[in-house]
Design a protein with these regions (language model features):
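Active-site entrance/lid segments in N-terminal catalytic domains of soluble metabolic enzymes
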Residues: 1-161
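Conserved active-site-proximal phosphate/metal-binding subdomains
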Residues: 2, 137-140, 144-163, 169-290
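Conserved acidic functional residues
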Residues: 112, 166-167
């Protein structure tokens, strides 16, 4: 059993400098400094979406996630990279100029991908880490391949550390992926009901009541055509959004007026989200079988 004071030795923990092979998903729209801080202090890699203040460096390694449809100028990426250990990109083809902007700030650069070809492109662009996202993931889904098929192919295709992402909600699942060669796992859905997360109460309650079969992949939430692509959400939110005509990609925050008619992102691991827990406790649970 991995205790918070122990280090699990993987290429990820050695490179990033954290104790546990876990990365918090940036959770755009609801991710907070407090959530990332709890994960960093607990031994993982805490992440915030671009625009949210990263946690203090003394708490542990942290990172900033950038979405390609809304990526800022290179100089802004470089400045952000100077404040964190990792910058990560998602929802776009790997771009060596963006990778260079992250490196210029002194950060490691990660790219979340949905296919082996995209993983190879990320490594060729100079990325230090590749996140292999299985189709089980919540939120925007880049590929169509289940994680158990994608991971062995990705590990064989690239030489940089590979993180597994998508549908990871149990300690046993995390341990199995690490044992099978993953350098770390990336988790998002399990943290959505944490008190440190900016999730609307109604959204959190819907997550707690949901099972694995209650998620669907849809292209409806495309931000009015600005961000096309598939996303995994709670099925009930899709029905309500279609009735209201809402197409916003923004997940329901505590300030949302009609939270359950918005993009209620959830991965297939939602079935393992059964109660509200502090982020540090979630991380300990996930690491308990390592």
């Amino acid at each position: 059993m991995a205790l918070p004071s122990e280090t699990v030795d993987t290429r990820f923990t050695r490179l990033v400098g954290c104790r546990l092979p876990f990365q918090l998903a940036a959770l755009g729209g609801v991710g907070t400094t407090e959530l990332a801080a709890a994960v960093s202090a607990g031994g993982g890699l805490g992440m915030v979406p671009y625009g949210v203040e990263p946690p203090a460096a003394e708490l542990g390694p942290a990172g900033i996630g950038f979405l390609i449809p809304y990526v800022p100028p290179a100089r802004v990426i470089t400045e952000a990279a100077s404040r964190v250990r990792v910058v990560e990109f998602f929802q776009g083809d790997p771009d060596e100029n963006l990778v260079a902007a992250g490196h210029d700030g002194g950060a490691l650069v990660s790219w979340q991908v949905g296919s082996v070809d995209e993983g190879r492109a990320a490594a060729a662009a100079g990325c230090d880490l590749v996140v292999a996202q299985g189709v089980e993931a919540g939120g925007h889904v880049r590929g169509t391949t289940p994680l158990d098929q994608l991971m062995p192919a990705m590990l064989a295709a690239v030489s940089v550390p590979v993180l597994a992402a998508g549908g990871i909600g149990r300690a046993e699942r995390a341990a199995a992926l690490i044992a099978a060669g993953a350098d770390a796992v990336r988790v998002g859905t399990r943290f959505l009901a944490c008190p440190e997360c900016n999730t609307h109460t109604a959204y959190a309650e819907a997550l707690l009541a949901a099972g694995a079969d209650d998620t669907v992949i849809t292209g409806d939430f495309d931000d009015g055509g600005h961000w096309p692509g598939a996303a995994r959400v709670l099925g009930g939110s899709l029905i309500r959004a279609r009735r209201s005509g809402n197409r916003s990609t923004m997940p329901p925050t505590r300030a949302a007026e009609h939270p359950l008619a918005m993009a209620c992102y959830a991965g297939m691991s939602v079935a393992h989200l059964t109660r509200i827990q502090p982020a540090a406790e979630v991380l300990r649970d996930l690491a308990s079988q390592l």
